[in-house]
Amino acid sequence: METDILIIGSGAAGLTAALQLAQKHKVTVLAKGALSDGATAWAQGGIAAVLEPGDTFESHIEDTMVAGAGLNNRQTVEFVIEHAPQAIDRLAKLGVPFNLGGPTNEFGEQWHLTREGGHSHRRIVHVNDATGWAVQQALESAARDNPNITLVPDMVAIDLIVGRHQERFSTSGRV
């Protein structure tokens, strides 16, 4: 099997990376089991983002720093929080059916927002209590529909040969 980019893992991170990279490269995604067997599909609550009038990035950042007892990397927290609204909009465009029922946001959507522990504002978008499953299904569908992405379930990498110099890397399983 030859590919420009090999991604090991078919959860939200792996599939999101595959969709982004497939704009310019041939991408193969390996999953050690079924594509939806990872942790993403089990996430229940929702995704936090500043989407409500009156909420601010600064407030969300402070809530996150307090919840992390100051152990979080502030630059990382700021980056994630400032990009969360656009990430949620991308997920919605991929077909994640976030619950509706809130005020119209900057994307013209009326997502229902909840408030969960550690948050000072309503900022959790959700799909009932199965947000992870909905996100996983939307990402899988988009990846399946992309001609530059090959999805390989039930495959654990063991010997990978990469680059012009035939460097060899080993992990458990087999390709």
Task: Enumerate the language-model features and the residues they cover.
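Conserved N-terminal/central alpha/beta ligand/cofactor-binding core
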Residues: 32-174
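Phosphate-coordination loops involved in phosphoryl transfer and adenosine-cofactor binding
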Residues: 2-4, 154
